[in-house]
Amino acid sequence: MPYCERCFDEFEDEIEEYGYKPTPIFYGNGKRYFGVELEVDEGGKDNDNAAALKSIANVHEENIYIKSDGSLEDGFEIVSHPMTLEYHTEEMNWKEILREAVAMGYRSHQTSTCGLHIHVNRNAFGDNQAEQEDVISRILFFVEKHWNELFTFSRRSSYNMSRW
């Protein structure tokens, strides 16, 4: 739908571009921070839906933002700022966000297009670079050793896994 110049200038796109990466805001107190990227699909790449989900999550703080994702057919990615596990479970209103997303027609687990990505800050792995590198190498060893089980757990096809 075309907009007049004034409306176009006032229009706020609630869905950021794929490459959007704001300055992280860390929530909670602790050593480990987790950022969540939840892909949802089948409900539309819709500004009003994105705004509604953000209004649930961002009542007091900017906890989430929403991004485009080219791997999705008709949805977007809900991205949290880094938070401690306690903040995610006690302060973030994930249950209401997800309930509303489902009510809007979004799906995640029940699709072949969506994924859940958890980012962890490097300092969670140790107090210095040597400790961090040691833990990261053990994680890589675990992934290599248990690749077949992780592949099954991921629910990805061989084609999708090769793209990853």
Show the residue positions of the predicted features.
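Terminal catalytic/cofactor-binding subdomain
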Residues: P2-G105
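Arginine residue identity/basic-tract feature
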Residues: R6, R32, R99, R107, ...
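Aromatic/basic-lined ligand-recognition segments
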Residues: G75, A130-W164
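Histidine-centered divalent-metal-coordination microenvironment in nucleic-acid enzymes
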Residues: G75, H109-F125
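Short loop/turn segments at secondary-structure transitions that flank enzyme active sites
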Residues: T84, A124, E149
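Intrinsic-disorder/low-complexity, polar/charged segments
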Residues: T84-Y87, T111-S112, N128
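Intrinsically disordered, low-complexity coil segments
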Residues: H88-T89, G105, A124-S137
